[in-house]
Amino acid sequence: MRKLLVKLMIALMAFALIPVQVAQACSAFIVGKELTTDGSMLFGRTEDYPYAPDGGRHNKTYEVVPAKDYKDGDMLEDESNGFAYPHLSHEMKYTATYDAAHGDGSNGNFGAHGFNEAGVSMTSTVSATPHDKILEADPLVKNGLAEAAMVDLVLPRAKTAREGIELVAKVLDEKGSAEGNIIVVADKDELWYMEILSGHQYVAIKFPQDRYAIFANTYYLGHVDFKDKENVIASKDVEAVAKKADHYKTDKDGNFHIADSYGPDEYTERNRSRTYAGITLMDPKADIKYDDKHFDLLHKPTDPSKKYSLEDVFAEQRNRFEHLKQYTPDDLVEPGKEVDTNKYKYALGNENVINAHVYQIKKDLPTPFGGVVWLGLAQSRNTPYVPFYGIVNDTYAPFKVRSAKYDPTSWYWAVWHIDQMVMKYPDLFGNSIQEKWKELEKGWIKEQAALDQKYSGLTDDQAKATADEVTSDSLKRAETIFKQIKQVESEMEDKIRTEKGLEADFVYDGYNKANLVAAAQAKKDASKETEKKEETASSQSSSKASDSNSSLSAVLGVLALAGFGLAGFYFKKSKKNENEE
C-alpha cells in the first residue's frame, strides 16, 4: 500500500509539471491600411510554445473545418478546462491551425488563427497576466472562455469583425474568462483589437488605420473613450473593478489608464525585449527607451512617408536583434553557462515559435476570399511564408499530418527540422536558409498580387463559384513548395554528412537550448536521486547488518548462558553424586 501511495504521489507531481498549453510567449503586430504599401490591412502573430522538454517542438496542422448543422443541445466543448457553449443550428466553414493533438482529450484544440466563409479573420491569442489585486476583485473562471476554444467559438458564427468581438464580450459576460488574453478580429472593412483583462472585464477598440502596433504578453491599452460606442466595446464595470481592487491608475492627464490598472507593475524582460525590438525595427527613430515604464499600443512612424510591406512584417516576426547590436538572442547561450541578462534577451524570432502567420486583408478582394494568410509553420527565423486564400475548401496533405515526433511527410516537421539543423550547425548554414526563403518569397508575392488582380472584380456569388479552382491551385502550389522544402532539407543533411561525418547528429530530436538545459537539469536531478537511493540503501544495509550482528550476539549470549547453566548443572550434580558416594 505504501509503495502504491508513493507511486501515486510521483505521478501526481509529474502531472502537475505538464502544462495545459497556453501560448504564454506569443507576440503580435497590426499595421493599418493607411500605412501599407498596397493599402491592405496587415496583422499577425507568432505562437510560441516554451514548455520544456518540448519547447518549440509542437506540431500544428492547417485545416479546413466544413460548415455543419447541429441539433438542439449540441455543445462546443473545450477539453482543456470544461468550458461549454451551445452550437448554432448552422455554423460556417472556416480554417484553423490546430494543435496536432486536438480532439484526443489531452489539451484542447488551440485553433490559433483562420478565415471563415464570411470573410472574417482572427488570431487568438496573445496571453496576458492580470495584476494580482485585479484577480482578487474579479477572479478568472476555471471553466470560462480560454484560448483553446476561441477560434472555434468565433469563426463559425461571426459574419463581421464587430460581431466576433460582440460575441466574445457576450460570452465573457455570461461565462467569464479562464485567462487574460488579447485577440484580433478583422473583416475587409475594419479590424478590432481586444484585451480580456480579468474574469469578466474587457475592452476592445476599432483599430485606427493610420497606426501600427507591436504587442507581446501583457496589456497595452491606455485611455479610451467609453462613450464612443462606435469604436469601443467594453464591459460595464471595467473602471469599477479597478477601483474595487485599489489599483485604479491614471495617465498624466488624470484619465483612467487600462494597462496600468489591470496589468502587472512591471513588464517581464521577455515582454519588454520583444516589444522594444518590434517598435524600433518598424521605426528606428521611435521616441522610446528600453526601460520605459510602459509602451503605448498605437504608433505612427516618425517618417510620415513610411509605408510597410509584407517583407517588413515577415522581418518583424523573424527579428533576432539584428538592428540592436547590443543585444543577442538568449537561445544562443550555451546550456549550463551563466546568462548576462543585460546582453542576452528574448527575441521575436526565438526558438519557441511553432506557428508564425501574417494576414493580408485587401478591400478589393471579394468577401468570401477573406484575404490571404501567409503561413509560416515552425520557427519564424528559418521558415518560408506561403500564401493561401481564406476561401479554400481543403489543405495540402502534409499540413494535416498529426504525428507528435519528426515525420518526413509533415510540412511542420520538415520546416522545423530545417530550423533545428541551422541552429545546431551555424558554421555550415549561417543565414543562408533564411535568405533562400526570402528570395522565393519575392516571387510568391508577385504571383499572389497577380492572382489578387485576377479575382478582385468578382461578385461574392462568382467568388464562391471559384472555391474549387482556388483550392486546386493552392494544393498544386503547396505541393511544389513542399518539394522545394524537402530538397533543402535533403541538401542540408548531405552537407552535415559530408562536413561532420556519418555519426553526426542530424537533429531529428531538435536543438532547443531551453530543452537542453531542462534535460541537463533532469539528468543532474536523476543522478542526485540515484546517489540518494544508494546512500539510503547502504544505510539500510548497514542497519540490517547491525541488527543481524545484534541478533547474533543475543543468540550467542543466550547460548553462552545456557552453556554456563548446563555446566553449572552438571558440576552441581557431579558434586552431589560425589557426596552421595
Residue ranges and their predicted role:
Residues 26-146, 167-308:
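A contiguous strand-loop segment
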Residues 330-459:
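Substrate-recognition/cap regions that form aromatic- and gly/pro-loop-enriched pockets
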Residues 438-531:
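Histidine-centered catalytic/metal-binding microenvironments
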Residues 524-549, 580-581:
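C-terminal low-complexity, Ser/Thr- and acidic/Pro-rich disordered "stalk" regions positioned immediately N-terminal
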Residues 548-564, 570:
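Short, hydrophobic alpha-helical membrane anchors of single-pass surface/secreted proteins
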Residues 564-581:
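C-terminal membrane-anchoring or membrane-association module
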